[in-house]
UniProtKB/Swiss-Prot annotation:
One of its GO terms (cellular component) is cytosol. It comes from Vibrio cholerae serotype O1 (strain ATCC 39315 / El Tor Inaba N16961). Keywords: Aminoacyl-tRNA synthetase, ATP-binding, Cytoplasm, Ligase, Nucleotide-binding, Protein biosynthesis. This is Glutamine--tRNA ligase. Belongs to the class-I aminoacyl-tRNA synthetase family. Gene3D superfamilies: Glutamyl-trna Synthetase, Domain 2, Glutamyl-tRNA Synthetase, Domain 3, HUPs, Ribosomal Protein L25, Chain P. Monomer. CDD domains: GlnRS_core.
Length: 556
């Protein structure tokens, strides 16, 4: 990453500092291990920033490892999208991309070792019976009738599993630990199951696949990971993580540390719920700009630096909490306010005619791209007799608090002249169709010579030179702060989470690059859509408003 960011402090970094000071480790090696069965979301970004950020700050290494032990739900599309997202966020992994499937041969050998030590057995209970025998939080489990098979018998049966002689669900390999443990994860967990599925990396070489808890710790150890960082739901699994490594012949024994996952208001993070949104066509896809996926946020106009800043601000703790959506919006708003060039766009246009400006004349005005950054340069904007302004920027009559255009009153056009509304035309329904004005030609870049005060400023686009555009006005996807807690979360979808309107932009925006953010003056921050926008048919997505539109709602 290019910018120098202050090193954050949290309990995990304090552990690392102590490990280095005590000589427990001489270097730091972390990993980010997603399963390639879906698209990354903002919650994954927290883990990415933590793991890659630690490696970066301690001059260590961070592996990108795909936890690919479930071939039926995984594919290369997800592998490529995850690599793209990590790179886009500004991080590079150490060496080649790793896959848990790289270690399938070693994992099989370690399973054999556990069998030889009498610590694993082939069970022929059905999956339903295994669940039944496991017990509950208040009742201990009971032993499988196959638990006391001999080592020789288990070795032979495990080889038959590998040879494809058992059907799916007919046999599995289980660890022999403690069926009375207060931790259900330690009640003889399944280590291998039969799956006749082709794998995106290993093809049809295997018909048995290792479970996550068996694979994860061994993969960490084989890669020399020093600090295995995961979210709190794996806290109990740490006991199995340590048990596996304690009972196999492997030189490295990483330690697992847990932190709270990201819970964000007005959205859902569950892969199942996100998939439901897509499959039921409640959104347009995984990269819908209303989705919390990295690809959705990117399409909406979020920047990598804003997402990294968000992850930095929320911090890393063991405390579960719900983060306000406005915290995420604040990060992108701050980023774009600092870095986005300004431009003018009219989203709800009404025509304005300057009667004392010569017809057919085009005056080229020079406007700054950023009010506080002269190094960002200027742009040329055409000014003509007929303009578009926002419908809400005109009233026939108004009180003194209204600082925009009023019939018989004056206002300044952004970067241009002072105008006065003289008269209007309406259609048969009483809607204003045209506002006729006069302009003061001596007010370009200066106040009226006679000293009269003109306080209001409104934006505009040339009606003759402006370019038509579609604007997609995105809001929060749900109407309640915690939609995941609803009986039917889909019923809490915000019907106004996407509103499409037609308007006009200044001609310089014809060449707007997808995902590149602009501040449309007085309207918000927008970017050209990375799928649907073209110079022939411009489409702009609203990234975020100039201020929090939900603040007042939340207070009520």
């Amino acid at each position: 990453m290019s910018e120098a960011e202050a090193r954050p402090s949290n309990f995990i970094r304090q552990i690392i500092d102590k490990d280095l000071a005590d000589g427990k480790h001489t270097t730091v090696h972390t990993r980010f291990p997603p399963e390639p069965n879906g698209y990354l979301h903002i919650g994954h970004a927290k883990s990415i920033c933590l793991n890659f950020g630690i490696a970066q700050d301690y001059q260590g290494q961070c592996n990108l490892r795909f936890d690919d032990t479930n071939p039926e739900k995984e594919n290369l599309e997800y592998v490529e999208s995850i690599k793209k997202d990590v790179t886009w966020l500004g991080f590079d992994w150490s060496g080649e991309v790793c896959y848990s499937s790289d270690y399938f041969d070693k994992l099989y050998e370690y399973a054999i070792e556990l069998i030889q030590k009498g610590l694993a057995y082939v069970d022929e209970l059905t999956p339903e019976q295994i669940r039944e025998y496991r017990g509950t939080l208040t009742e201990p489990g009971k032993h499988s009738p196959y638990r006391d098979r001999s080592v020789e018998e288990n070795l032979a049966l495990f080889e038959k599993m590998r040879a494809g002689e058992f059907a799916e669900g007919q046999a599995c390999l289980r660890a022999k630990i403690d069926m009375a443990s207060s931790f259900i994860v330690m009640r003889d967990p399944v280590l291998y199951r039969v799956r006749f599925a082709e794998h995106h990396q290993t093809g049809d070489k295997w018909c048995i696949y290792p479970m996550y808890d068996f694979t994860h710790c061994i993969s960490d150890a084989l890669e020399g990971i020093t600090h295995s960082i995961c979210t709190l739901e794996f806290q109990d699994n740490r006991r199995l993580y340590d048990w596996v490594l304690d009972n196999i012949t492997i030189p490295c024994h990483p330690r697992q540390y847990e932190f709270s996952r990201l819970n964000l208001e007005y959205t859902v993070m569950s892969k199942r719920k996100l998939n439901q949104l897509v499959t039921e066509k409640l959104v347009t896809g995984w990269d819908d700009p209303r989705m919390p996926t990295i690809s959705g946020l990117r399409r909406r106009g979020f920047t990598p630096s804003a997402i990294r800043e968000f992850c930095k601000r929320i911090g890393v703790t063991k405390q579960e909490n719900m983060i306000e959506y406005s915290a995420l919006e604040s990060c992108i708003r701050d980023d774009l306010n600092e870095n986005a060039p300004r431009a003018m766009a009219v989203l709800d246009p009404v025509k304005l005619v300057i009667e004392n400006f010569a017809a057919g004349t085009v005056e080229t005005l020079t406007l700054a791209n950023h009010p506080n950054k002269p190094e960002m340069g200027d742009r040329e904007v055409p000014f003509t007799r007929e303009l578009w302004i926002e419908r809400e920027d005109f009233r026939e009559e108004a009180n003194k608090k209204y600082k925009r255009l009023v019939l018989g009153k004056e206002v300044r056009l952004r970067g241009a002249y002072v105008i006065k509304a003289e008269r209007i035309e309406k259609d048969e329904q009483g809607n204003i169709t045209t506002i006729f004005c006069s302009y003061d030609p001596e007010t370009l870049g200066k106040n009226p010579a006679d000293g009269r005060k003109v306080k209001g400023v409104i934006h505009w686009v040339s009606a003759e030179k402006g370019v038509p555009a579609e604007f997609r006005l995105y809001e929060r996807l749900f109407t309640v702060p915690n939609p995941g807690a609803a009986d039917n979360f889909a019923e809490t979808i915000n019907p106004e989470s996407l509103v499409k309107v037609q308007g006009y932009v200044e001609p310089s925006l014809v060449e707007a690059k997808p995902e590149f953010g602009y501040q449309f003056e007085r309207m918000g921050y927008f970017c050209a859509d990375n799928k649907d926008s073209s110079p022939q048919a411009l489409v702009f997505n609203r990234t975020v408003g100039l201020r929090d539109s939900f603040a007042k709602i939340d207070e009520e």
